[in-house]
Amino acid sequence: MSKVCEISGKRPIVANSIQRRGKAKREGGVGKKTTGISKRRQYPNLQKVRVRVAGQEITFRVAASHIPKVYELVERAKGLRLEGLSPKEIKKELLKLL
């Protein structure tokens, strides 16, 4: 499974992990010194959200910040004719509403 939000497109980003030593100036020291910088990845907080649309259960992988958007899509879909479609097709139709 990819680590990408299906609604917002949030994906892992590259950040730096900075190792420091010393005592902060505000605590009476001479200041923090950087002893090493290495790359690390920050992942979005992806959650699986299952909803029922047109009698079908559909699973979305979305960032936690976009979970309400899934339920908003389900509300908007109530006017659409989705009966007889596969879950994959229903999901495509819902994502078109964005």
Curated annotation (Swiss-Prot):
Matching InterPro entries: Bacterial_rp_bL28, Ribosomal_bL28, Ribosomal_bL28/bL31-like_sf, Ribosomal_bL28_bact-type
Record GO biological process: translation
Domain of life: Bacteria
Keywords from the UniProt entry: Ribonucleoprotein, Ribosomal protein
Entry annotated with the keyword Manganese: no
Keyword Magnesium: no
GO molecular function, one term: structural constituent of ribosome
Listed transmembrane segments: none
GO cellular component: ribonucleoprotein complex; ribosome
NCBIfam families noted in UniProt: L28 (TIGR00009)
Family affiliation: Belongs to the bacterial ribosomal protein bL28 family.
UniProt name for this protein: Large ribosomal subunit protein bL28
